[in-house]
Design a protein with these regions (language model features):
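Long, hydrophobic/aromatic-enriched structural stretches that serve as scaffold segments
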Residues: 55-58, 63-97
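Hydrophobic, proline/glycine-rich low-complexity stretches
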Residues: 1-73, 217-220, 227-267
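Internal, well-folded beta-alpha domain core
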Residues: 29, 88-269
Length: 269
């Protein structure tokens, strides 16, 4: 496979060692973010991770989108995975030993069962198989629906959203802004069934963000993990498209408890 020269000037750390393992393209994303208390989020994190905060607040993000151009290095295309919708619930963390910032996913829903199985096996991520659809209403307007399969209690997300077009303020998120804090993350963290903390490197160019509007009719994702979202309008952004590179998951350290008391860190600036 031909190697691609990657832009790295925006990264706070060098690229991970070795070669990337997978590429994907993420399309028509809504970033919906709510402030949360650090303690409420921290109690759900695995040992070894701290809540990363912006101006004293933790943040929970719900991100619906659809992906395509999925390629695993050295592996034929995944059957039926040419493109499919995805939905995730995430927060922002640091490794308490190294300070490395990243994303921690509480849940990820996808409509392709084989892709769910591969992601669970290779990246230890909490993927769920879901009935999903995304319908384009206009150039930047979408209707999104997700209902998790094989669960006792329905976990449903239903929303309409639209991007409002690029602005100079959001043309490219800058360090120190909330937009940068929420989107410029280059590692994902998870814990496997043995309670071991794992991480994987991610690479992309800076997110091209737009302001957005959304009508969220139903959102059960946070309640499914025991968090009540505040009754307030979320911070909304839209992004048209971004190519993403993922490195293999690696073990950070063994023998961790899957849950512990909250640990919180506030970034400088």
């Amino acid at each position: 496979m031909r190697e691609i020269k990657l832009r790295t000037s925006q990264r706070p750390r060098p690229l991970p060692p070795g070669r990337w393992a997978m590429t994907q393209r993420w399309n028509d994303l809504l970033f919906a973010h709510w402030q949360a208390t650090p303690g409420a989020v921290g109690r759900l994190l695995p040992e070894g991770l701290q809540v990363d905060t912006f101006q004293g607040s933790a943040w929970l993000g719900v991100v619906p989108f659809w992906m395509d151009r999925i390629k695993i290095r050295g592996v034929p295309p995944i059957p039926g995975a040419r493109s499919f919708p995805e939905l995730n619930l995430r927060t922002y963390v640091r490794d308490h030993r190294t300070g490395m910032q990243g994303v921690y996913f509480f849940s990820l829903d996808a409509s392709n069962l084989l892709a769910v199985a591969i992601a669970r096996s290779c990246y230890h991520l909490p993927y769920y198989w879901a009935e999903m659809r995304i319908e384009q209403q206009s150039e930047r307007e979408f209707a999104f629906y997700s209902r998790r399969r094989l669960t006792r209690t329905p976990v449903i997300f239903k929303a309409r959203y639209r991007g409002l077009g690029p602005t100079r303020r959001l043309a490219e998120s800058r360090s120190g802004t909330l937009e940068y804090f929420l989107t410029e993350r280059y590692y994902l963290f998870a814990h496997n069934r043995g309670g071991e903390l794992v991480r994987a490197g991610i690479h992309h160019v800076p997110w091209p963000l737009e302001d957005a509007e959304a009508e969220i009719e139903r959102n059960d994702l946070a309640e499914a993990i025991g968090i009540q979202l505040p009754d307030q309008q979320p911070v909304l952004h839209y992004s048209r498209r971004l190519a993403v590179y993922l490195w293999p998951a690696e073990l950070v350290r063994p023998a961790l408890s899957p849950r512990r008391a909250p640990a919180v860190v506030t970034p400088s600036g």
